[in-house]
Structure formats: structure tokens, C-alpha cells
């Protein structure tokens, strides 16, 4: 149960993390997220006026902090495509938690623009960064991002980010059977002794455009089996309650890896994350079918108290645990799930 005064949902799960999508656009067309046959030249992305402004985002974050949020992650789409993203980072970096501590302010990126923006992001107050990287082999990486983008450019961005101090830097690899699962060991080998934490994520049924099927999932247990065949691994305890990754370290001290088993070992029971979409809708689950329109309140003249009360009401009524129900075979039929590119991963 959360500490006294923290906002909790129907299962006692505290509101602690807020993921904010700052754009629905991306310069990649990854096959599991924004497949090119759907997100083509005719796809209607949001207009700038539909996006939350930086001032609106800052106001929202202040209100979420009042309810106990301590960690903010900026996502997309690709967040580095949002013009002047450094200014938003600077605005949010000035804020403190309810306990007077600096916010844990992070960002997830595909790394394509990271080399040119890393220093400015660090100077603006970004704490650290997570990079999505689904292969170390260039041909495989180009096929996964489907825009013929070279892996060397992302690796350069990672090096620059690490050099300017956006650390500990994490890398997320979504593992899809038959597409990039042959990259598990090579990616691990590349980042051993680098100080970078590599995490392997089970391919998820987020949205409906990626044509997900269970047969394409490589279970985390299989990922660990393959890694253990190449390197001696030792389990690590969680850093904090509700951590999504199961942590492991190399026995020779070469670093840390993790697996995120969102399909085979769902962690809904201690999920503390809310998501704010690009146009200001509050989603309580990555697999949600609908959100609560907070932008309408902001632009309709609602007071901070009215918006804060809306956040409280929505979170306290939260019952979401889709992944646990999916795993047990009892997930009810749902409507059209929101796409990952709209609310971030």
C-alpha cells in the first residue's frame, strides 16, 4: 500500500511515474510500432495546435507532482523531433517532488538525433536517457527501422550521450522472433564493459497495427537461457518496488542486463505508471482503449483544483491489469487499443 497521503487506485497502486508523449511523429517506421503500410505519407498526424504546449505540460506535471509523481519520462513518437524540446526539459528540471527532491527526468529516444542534441539536453537538466536499439548488425537494424537508417549513427549518439553524462544510459531491445532474435547475444557482447544497461523487452500487443501474435514473442526465460550459454550471469534484486525489469549481472563484473517480461510474467500488480498523450489525454495502461481528456479541462478554463480533482478521480477508479488477464486467458474483449506511438512505450 502507498504511504499515507499518496494517490492510490482500486488495487492500492500508487501514482508514481508519468510518461508524457510530446509528439506522435517519428523518423523511423519500426515494424512492431509504426509499420510503414499504416503510417505512410497519407497518415494524418496531429497538427501543432492539437499538441499540449510546453506551458500546458509544465502545468500538468506540477499537478501530478502534488499527487506524488516523482519520475517523468518524455516519449513520443520520437521526442527529439519536437521543436525546442530542450526548453521543455529546462522547464521541468526546475520542478521538485513533494519531498523537495529533484524530479527524476528521463527521455526515451531512437537515438537518430541524439549526437547533436545530447549536450543541450544535459545542459537543460535531463537526468538520463534510454535508447531503443533493436540490432547491432547494420542490415538487421535497417530492416527493423524500415527507413534504411544506419546503426553506426545511433551508436555514435549513444557514445556522445554517455560522454556528456546522461547516465546511467539504458538501451532497450524489443525482441521479435524471426526478425531480430539472433541479435540478443551480439548486442550483449557489444555493450559488455561499457557501463550501459541493456534490457530485452518481450514483443507486446500494443495497438492493433503491428499484427501481433504470440508466436512472435521470445519469452524472457529464453533470452536469459541464450545469454547464459554465452556468459555467466547472476541475478540481482530490484532497485525499487514496481521495477519492470528483472535484473542480472555478468559474473565477471562486465555490467548489467535486464529482461522485461510484459507478456509472460505481467507486472500489473505493482504498476505505478500513468501516460499523458500528445494531445493531453490521460491513459492508465499501455493497453488502454480510451483516455480522459485533460486538455479539454486546461483549455476550457478549469482551475488547478478542478484539474487536480479530475486526475484524482480517474486514478482512484483505475482497475487496469490487462497483461495479467491476458496471461491468465481471462482478458475480456476490448475496443481498439491505442497505438504505442501515441502514448509512448
Swiss-Prot record:
How many cofactors are bound and how?
Binds 2 [4Fe-4S] clusters. Binds 1 [4Fe-4S] cluster coordinated with 3 cysteines and an exchangeable S-adenosyl-L-methionine and 1 [4Fe-4S] cluster coordinated with 3 cysteines and the GTP-derived substrate.
What EC number(s) is this enzyme filed under? 4.1.99.22
Q: How does it assemble?
A: Monomer and homodimer.
Q: Entry's Pfam families?
A: Fer4_12, Mob_synth_C, Radical_SAM
Q: What biological function has been recorded for the protein in this entry?
A: Catalyzes the cyclization of GTP to (8S)-3',8-cyclo-7,8-dihydroguanosine 5'-triphosphate.
Read off the PANTHER family from this record: MOLYBDENUM COFACTOR BIOSYNTHESIS PROTEIN 1, MOLYBDOPTERIN COFACTOR SYNTHESIS PROTEIN A
Q: In which pathway does it act?
A: Cofactor biosynthesis; molybdopterin biosynthesis
Q: Which domain of life is it from?
A: Bacteria
Q: Please write the reaction equations for the catalytic activity of this protein.
A: GTP + AH2 + S-adenosyl-L-methionine = (8S)-3',8-cyclo-7,8-dihydroguanosine 5'-triphosphate + 5'-deoxyadenosine + L-methionine + A + H(+)
Please list the residues that bind [4Fe-4S] cluster 1: 26, 30, 33
This protein's species is Ralstonia nicotianae (strain ATCC BAA-1114 / GMI1000)
Q: Which residues bind [4Fe-4S] cluster 2?
A: 268, 271, 285
State if Repeat is listed as a keyword. no
Q: Which family is this protein grouped under?
A: Belongs to the radical SAM superfamily. MoaA family.
Cofactor dependence is on:
[4Fe-4S] cluster
Ranges for domain Radical SAM core come to: 10-234
The cross-references to SMART domains, in alphabetical order and at most eight, read: Elp3 (SM00729)
Q: What is this protein called?
A: GTP 3',8-cyclase
User: Per its UniProt record, what InterPro entries does this chain match?
Assistant: Aldolase_TIM (IPR013785), Elp3/MiaA/NifB-like_rSAM (IPR006638), MoaA (IPR013483), MoaA_NifB_PqqE_Fe-S-bd_CS (IPR000385), MoaA_twitch (IPR010505), MoCo_biosynth_MoaA/MoaC (IPR050105), rSAM (IPR007197)
NCBIfam families for this protein: moaA
Query: Which keywords does this Swiss-Prot/TrEMBL entry list?
Result: 4Fe-4S, GTP-binding, Iron, Iron-sulfur, Lyase, Metal-binding, Molybdenum cofactor biosynthesis, Nucleotide-binding, S-adenosyl-L-methionine
Q: GO:BP terms for this protein?
A: Mo-molybdopterin cofactor biosynthetic process
User: For this protein, what is any one GO molecular function term?
Assistant: metal ion binding
**Enzyme kind, highest EC tier:** lyase
Positions bound to GTP: 19, 73, 108, 170, 273-275
Q: Does the record carry Lipid biosynthesis as a key word? A: no
Q: Where does S-adenosyl-L-methionine bind?
A: 32, 77, 132, 204
Q: Which gene encodes it?
A: moaA
